[in-house]
């Protein structure tokens, strides 16, 4: 789903159901495209959880649910909280989906204020409010995550968790995964192909496609490299030092994820006019 922009996903749903608008459609589309933000970190933690924790809890008399709540859930909580933070910040910064679905959010109001007003002060004030909201989400995530620490007693290496047969729940679980994939990836892809085939004005221009592809790859590659160079020192610092300054720097790095392109563009335009 991360490969499908939110406005493209919203456009495909609007093409299939023209009456969609408001909070519920916007919430559904943004939830579908944001699934990997939570699934990837939680899945990474689950793949590394030592089954010895659950085995010890079961030995001490805990049932499956109680054992999960006391051993596995605390290990998943930091990853789930971080994924939820990324999802919240992504939702704050989204502009395309909420605009197509006609649901007023800060990003849409900022853009409308910038286009309609001669004075850009109102847009700047709204942008500051958006940054403040992002800061609130970051602080809330830090408070919910708490001071997570983990110890392991013994010299043995951690074991990978074994696969558990789901039995009669196998097909419902598979159906749920397939349904999520269908709604988040398959449906938008099929609708895009259908719209392309139905279009009477569609003209294949290989040169334009190659140019657009090259520009996209170039922008993505340079952006990824710059982001890596900027984020790597922060990641190393956060992993090796747990003081207050490091946590502040780590939290500040998340705030940029909440800044929509329209806000960054306004800032660059204002900077260019001021120089």
Q: Where are the regions that the model predicts?
A:
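Active-site-proximal cofactor/substrate-binding loop regions of enzyme domains
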Residues: 11, 64-67
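Flexible interhelical linker loops that connect adjacent transmembrane helices
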Residues: 144-177
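Glycine/proline-centered hinge or cleavage motifs at structural transition points of membrane proteins
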Residues: 60-62, 74
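Glycine-rich helix-loop "coupling/hinge" segments at transmembrane-helix boundaries
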Residues: 92-118
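Peri-membrane helix termini and adjoining interfacial loops of integral membrane proteins
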Residues: 101-107, 148-157, 193, 197, ...
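Membrane-water interface segments at the C-terminal ends of transmembrane alpha-helices
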Residues: 1-47, 73-96, 123-142, 168-197, ...
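Conserved MFS/SLC helix-loop-helix module at the cytosolic interface between two early adjacent transmembrane helices
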Residues: 49-59, 67
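Membrane-helix interface/capping residues of multi-pass secondary transporters
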Residues: 53, 62-64, 95, 120, ...
């Amino acid at each position: 789903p991360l490969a499908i922009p939110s406005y493209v996903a919203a456009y495909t749903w609007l093409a299939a159901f023209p009456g969609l608008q408001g909070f519920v459609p916007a919430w559904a589309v943004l939830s579908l495209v944001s699934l990997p933000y939570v699934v990837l970190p939680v899945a990474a933690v689950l793949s590394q959880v030592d089954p010895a924790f659950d085995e010890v809890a079961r030995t001490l008399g805990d049932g499956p649910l109680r054992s999960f709540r006391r051993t596995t859930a605390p290990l998943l909580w930091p990853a789930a909280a971080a994924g939820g933070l990324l999802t919240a910040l992504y939702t704050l910064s989204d502009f395309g989906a909420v605009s197509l679905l006609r649901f007023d959010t800060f990003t849409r109001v900022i853009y409308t204020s910038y286009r309609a007003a001669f004075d850009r002060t109102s847009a700047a004030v709204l942008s500051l409010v958006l940054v403040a909201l992002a800061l609130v989400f970051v602080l809330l995530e830090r408070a919910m995550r708490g001071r997570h620490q983990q110890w392991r007693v013994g010299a043995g290496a951690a074991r990978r968790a074994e696969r558990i047969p789901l039995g009669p729940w196998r097909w419902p679980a598979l159906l749920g995964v397939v349904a999520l994939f269908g709604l988040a990836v398959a449906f938008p892809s099929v609708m895009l192909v259908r719209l392309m085939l139905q279009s009477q004005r569609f003209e294949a221009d290989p040169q334009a496609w190659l140019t657009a592809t090259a520009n996209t790859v170039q922008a993505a590659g340079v952006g990824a490299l710059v982001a890596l160079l900027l984020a790597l020192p922060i990641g190393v610092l956060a992993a090796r030092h747990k003081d207050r300054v490091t946590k502040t720097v780590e939290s500040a790095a998340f705030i940029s994820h909440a800044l929509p392109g329209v806000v960054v563009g306004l800032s660059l335009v204002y900077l260019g006019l001021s120089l």
